[in-house]
């Protein structure tokens, strides 16, 4: 009954969304849309985490609800509701890192009693989430990402006061684990981040040639670490200052070049191309970049390297002080700004992530507040034409 009630409210809101789209943005039918996914229980709060495209059959959205419970939403290629599912209350803390593999969706969450990282599997046939694997020695999962031959899982070990990186193979089996000392207990900050009662922190990880990088607590502060891909041994670090100054996003370009963003005591900087010494020690506040005062203080920033009409573009998505989603497009080769694009006008919007779509467009996942107070999932689709107009 609960799922049916949610289903009805989704359908009603999607109908309203279709009618109102033309008033908000000049979108091309069938290739562009704005969808806001509502819940008839107004007290419920939804905080989207990640999105993945399922071939040509639409999108799968992972979300938290009511602080840190786990929710999944399936929509078709036009953003229309297909089905949804709320996991049992003991599976909490869904983290960024959502994968479509062999017609199934995979993501990590956490057991609320043991705190153990748990791998979930979801299919369109089951329309539910099933436990695929439990990692009993990995607690407080924070972020996961895909690499060439598997996956990375970042977590926090409260017993050793350390950030842990676990390398998983393509079947999600453990290859190696390594820890990096924080030197103090940051469990309270971790819990505040996970339950969303305090500052949200920019955990991320990725691959750069024969090295991996991760952003997490190290040496008292949020820092970006560089490690060997073969065993996780640390080679370099860019130190932040506590949780007040740090790297907020990073994407590897080539050679020693990265596309970064950083925050420093409320100010935000975008660095579309910079060479880093991944075998040395640096400080995030020393990295020069363009300040962007329009962004929210200590803004969350999401970046990807995407192809736009045959041109490699570093795309950044973030949130503005005025309650809009802002996209920045930079040439990935020379780092020059190509264009910007604002999304959202009627309700306040926050950027969560985005994915380049199979039809050459862009699907932007966001958070919006209906009537200024009810936190809901939103999906904004840009057509290939709209993307090319500002990003190429």
Regions found by a protein language model. Give the residues of each.
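Blade-level signature of beta-propeller repeat domains, shared across WD40, Kelch, NHL, RCC1
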Residues: 350-392
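Beta-propeller blade signature
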Residues: 72-77, 118-125, 163-173, 222-230, ...
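Short glycine/acidic-enriched loop and turn motifs that connect beta-strands
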Residues: 65-69, 111-116, 156-162, 217-222, ...
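Bacterial Sec-dependent N-terminal signal peptides
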Residues: 1-3, 11-46
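Beta-strand-rich domains and repeat architectures in extracellular enzymes and scaffolds
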Residues: 39-70
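A short beta-strand motif characteristic of beta-propeller blades
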Residues: 33-42, 81-88, 127-134, 174-179, ...
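Repeated scaffold domains used in trafficking and secretory/extracellular systems
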Residues: 45-52, 91-100, 136-147, 185-205, ...
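Hydrophobic strand positions within the blades of repeat-based beta-sheet folds
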Residues: 51, 60-62, 72, 83, ...
